[in-house]
């Protein structure tokens, strides 16, 4: 799901039409405040937000979006007419994953959105693999605990079978018990 945030209805409609044509489910918001409410209710996979908006700017919205507690990562693209490299860096420092400078042609827009989609797919795969690794580690810890318990019982049994634990010999004592090194 993609959230398009822009105070210009025309810009929202242009972006929405392109995204829907490429197969994305799109939701729109006309302000940063409205977008933040929508994100709290149902976090989007990808956000495309105008930088310059009245009220909560795209930059401020990006920071607040990153502060939300979310189960999965949301890819954030800031849209701006600012082409100064320091401004672009400011957007990235605020938490944006990409900054697109207007005017944006459909091929460039599609390429950036698809790059974001690839990032999200990789992130989901990594999350699933981390979950599997964590579950496997938990099982291994349980198995390790059971093996330790069995070794302790085996040690007790071994000790119960010995009549004498040490034998005094000339020059020292000989232990009749084997002890594990670990």
Regions found by a protein language model. Give the residues of each.
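Alpha4 helix (beta4-alpha4-beta5 surface) of REC/receiver domains from two-component response regulators
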Residues: 60, 72-73, 83-98
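The feature encodes the CheY-like receiver
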Residues: 12, 53-55, 80, 84, ...
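Charged docking surfaces used in two-component/phosphorelay signaling
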Residues: 13-21
């Amino acid at each position: 799901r993609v959230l398009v945030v822009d105070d210009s209805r025309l810009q929202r409609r242009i972006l929405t039409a392109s995204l829907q044509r490429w197969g994305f489910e799109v939701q729109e918001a006309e302000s940063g405040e409205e977008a933040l409410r929508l994100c709290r209710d149902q976090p989007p996979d990808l956000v495309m937000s105008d930088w310059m908006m009245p009220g909560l700017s795209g930059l401020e919205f990006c920071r607040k979006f990153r502060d939300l507690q979310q189960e999965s990562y949301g890819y954030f693209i800031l849209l701006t007419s600012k082409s100064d490299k320091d401004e672009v860096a400011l957007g990235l420092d605020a938490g944006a994953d990409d900054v697109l400078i207007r005017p944006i042609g459909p091929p460039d827009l599609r390429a950036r959105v698809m790059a974001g989609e690839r990032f999200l797919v990789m992130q989901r795969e990594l999350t699933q693999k981390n979950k599997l690794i964590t579950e496997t580690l938990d099982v291994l810890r349980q198995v390790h605990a059971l093996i330790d318990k069995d070794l302790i019982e085996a040690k007790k049994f071994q000790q119960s079978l010995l009549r004498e634990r040490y034998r005094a010999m000339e020059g020292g004592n000989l232990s009749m018990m084997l002890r594990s090194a670990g």
